[in-house]
């Protein structure tokens, strides 16, 4: 194990701890001012759930809770990038682009939801097109950073190590599609997970920590150092956000936070060629998104529901399990997924 992390010496680990600490304390310090500002702007959660009267009734106590708290993630992550990453590197500005683009998309969606008063943001098609554009720009930029490196056409397969996907046009096309699915899919999956107090922030800590281990165990990746710094900050701000987002939540991250987190996590996985590992590390996100896909597919094809309600966490709410118990059980599942993902990544 020590040889795996030999490239990252004690001073580097100290730097990552510093990044984590700064992100954590900055999030704690800015939390209350941001919440107060959101309240003044009337950024309150819209509890209206069309065709989901029971869910609306279950969440009535959340109607006076401000949302769009994900702006904290934007502030802290941008601060981290400008403090710790060299401004002369293309990768630095790629992270700036990721944070601003995903954060802006989420913020705009939250604004539209607020104005329409019905809990509906921009249409699914509009959001999907914007996500594809952001992801395509990200992938092309990553390709230019790798500059034709052999590592660009590799893939970390769980329990099998790094394998080549080929340098042919077909291989590169496969890479592009997989990368696109990873970024867009993770962004939407985290967005779907953000439905209970503390659920998305807590599971983000685990997935990001697992991905950080992947970065530290693959020092030859061109972006491993930059990714490890950003992930350390993401873990720090996620922990800090839990102070205000755990039950009973004082603020919700909204799409501003969930789309940003998913976009950054997915992009970091692509930078590390760890798209398949993220399926394990973010197992909770996969289950949440999968439950929605299965539910929609079953309703359209069979005219029957598989779950009482989707995403998955609402299914358990419908069964009468308290919100805090559902979150606790999903935390346990997230921890197990993280451990399994780390083992799969380090298995040589």
Curated annotation (Swiss-Prot):
Which cofactors, if any, are listed as required? Mg(2+)
The reply to whether Transmembrane helix figures as a keyword in the UniProt entry is yes
Q: Where in the cell is it found?
A: Cell inner membrane
Return the EC number. 2.7.8.13
The catalysed reaction is:
UDP-N-acetyl-alpha-D-muramoyl-L-alanyl-gamma-D-glutamyl-meso-2,6-diaminopimeloyl-D-alanyl-D-alanine + di-trans,octa-cis-undecaprenyl phosphate = di-trans,octa-cis-undecaprenyl diphospho-N-acetyl-alpha-D-muramoyl-L-alanyl-D-glutamyl-meso-2,6-diaminopimeloyl-D-alanyl-D-alanine + UMP
Q: Which organism is it from?
A: Chlamydia caviae (strain ATCC VR-813 / DSM 19441 / 03DC25 / GPIC)
What GO annotations for molecular function exist for this entry?
metal ion binding; phospho-N-acetylmuramoyl-pentapeptide-transferase activity; UDP-N-acetylmuramoyl-L-alanyl-D-glutamyl-meso-2,6-diaminopimelyl-D-alanyl-D-alanine:undecaprenyl-phosphate transferase activity
**Listed NCBIfam families:** mraY
| Primary localization class, coarse | membrane
Q: Which domain of life is it from?
A: Bacteria
| TM annotation in the entry | 11-31, 68-88, 92-112, 128-148, 165-185, 196-216, 222-242, 251-271, 276-296, 326-346
**What does this chain do?**
Catalyzes the initial step of the lipid cycle reactions in the biosynthesis of the cell wall peptidoglycan: transfers peptidoglycan precursor phospho-MurNAc-pentapeptide from UDP-MurNAc-pentapeptide onto the lipid carrier undecaprenyl phosphate, yielding undecaprenyl-pyrophosphoryl-MurNAc-pentapeptide, known as lipid I.
One Pfam family assigned to this protein is: Glycos_transf_4
Gene name, per UniProt, is: mraY
Q: Which family does it belong to?
A: Belongs to the glycosyltransferase 4 family. MraY subfamily.
Q: What is this protein called?
A: Phospho-N-acetylmuramoyl-pentapeptide-transferase
For whether the record's keyword set contains Cell division, the answer is yes
One biological process term from GO is: cell division
Membrane topology, from the record: Multi-pass membrane protein
Give UniProt keywords alphabetically: Cell cycle, Cell division, Cell inner membrane, Cell membrane, Cell shape, Cell wall biogenesis/degradation, Magnesium, Membrane, Metal-binding, Peptidoglycan synthesis, Transferase, Transmembrane, Transmembrane helix
Which GO cellular component terms are attached?
A: plasma membrane
